[in-house]
């Protein structure tokens, strides 16, 4: 199972989190986010990481030109779209970045809203399901209603996100079967400042399921 820790702001924490077992790290490229990092900060963090760690830039309603430039300049291996991007935008981004993983985040309010996932699976590599919040795009600490995801089986891999912590991860994974999990606020002391004890506890809990 892939484990993505999102909202990394400190290079030394990124190295420690990767060594604890994370398979992917997320860097927020949304300027008004408290977890925002610059291209040079991302590049510095990526340079220190093992080659097998996926490095994902998180964008919201950015242009294809802007996304492409940041990916090239920073060395990111993936792009996560966390705004209101439509399937056609994902298709165009795929043409611009054919060798980069594209993840589309969907903020789920209801079972009906879950149906929009099928519109994206032709154009992206991976989906990410997050909890809906009217004002924040992610890192809200709100959990999804896992029950509505029990039958979710898209034609591509998917991450479960939304308020996951070491304390609820086992319960979440007893109800749903994602390809990976994504955590941000659930392993933090403050926005962007990861708590390595919480990260370690997360991997202990995940290991206990095996």
UniProtKB/Swiss-Prot annotation:
Keyword Signal among record annotations: no
Gene Ontology biological-process entries: L-tryptophan biosynthetic process
NCBIfam families to which the protein is assigned, alphabetical: PRK01222.1-4
UniProt cross-references to Gene3D superfamilies, sorted A to Z: Aldolase class I
Alphabetized HAMAP family for the sequence: PRAI (MF_00135)
Listed name of the protein: N-(5'-phosphoribosyl)anthranilate isomerase
Keyword Isomerase among UniProt keywords: yes
Classification via SUPFAM superfamilies: Ribulose-phoshate binding barrel (SSF51366)
Any matching Pfam family: PRAI
Pathway participation: Amino-acid biosynthesis; L-tryptophan biosynthesis; L-tryptophan from chorismate: step 3/5
Enzyme class: isomerase
Molecular function, one GO term: phosphoribosylanthranilate isomerase activity
Enzymatic reactions: N-(5-phospho-beta-D-ribosyl)anthranilate = 1-(2-carboxyphenylamino)-1-deoxy-D-ribulose 5-phosphate
Residue intervals passing through the bilayer: none
InterPro entries assigned: Aldolase_TIM, PRAI_dom, RibuloseP-bd_barrel, TrpF_fam
EC number of this enzyme: 5.3.1.24
Organism: Nostoc punctiforme (strain ATCC 29133 / PCC 73102)
Family statement drawn from the similarity comment of this UniProt entry: Belongs to the TrpF family.
Sorted UniProt keywords: Amino-acid biosynthesis, Aromatic amino acid biosynthesis, Isomerase, Tryptophan biosynthesis
């Amino acid at each position: 199972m892939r484990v993505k820790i999102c909202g990394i702001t400190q290079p030394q924490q990124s190295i420690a989190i990767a060594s604890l077992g994370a398979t992917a790290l997320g860097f927020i490229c949304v300027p008004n986010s408290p977890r925002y990092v610059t291209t040079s900060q991302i590049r510095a963090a990526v340079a220190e990481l093992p080659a097998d760690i996926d490095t994902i830039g998180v964008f919201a309603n950015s242009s294809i030109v802007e996304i492409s430039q940041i990916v090239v300049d920073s060395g990111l291996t993936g792009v996560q779209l966390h705004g209101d991007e439509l399937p056609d935008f994902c298709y165009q981004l795929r043409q611009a970045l054919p060798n980069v993983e594209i993840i589309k985040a969907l903020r789920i309010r209801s079972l009906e809203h879950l149906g929009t996932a099928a519109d994206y699976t032709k154009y992206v590599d991976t989906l990410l399901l997050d909890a809906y919040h009217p004002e924040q795009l992610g890192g809200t600490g709100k959990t999804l209603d896992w029950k509505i995801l029990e039958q979710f089986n898209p034609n591509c891999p998917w991450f479960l996100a939304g308020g996951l912590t070491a304390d609820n991860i086992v319960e979440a994974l007893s109800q749903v079967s994602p390809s990976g999990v994504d955590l941000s606020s659930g392993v933090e002391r403050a926005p962007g400042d990861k708590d390595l004890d919480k990260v370690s506890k997360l991997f202990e809990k995940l290991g206990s399921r095996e």
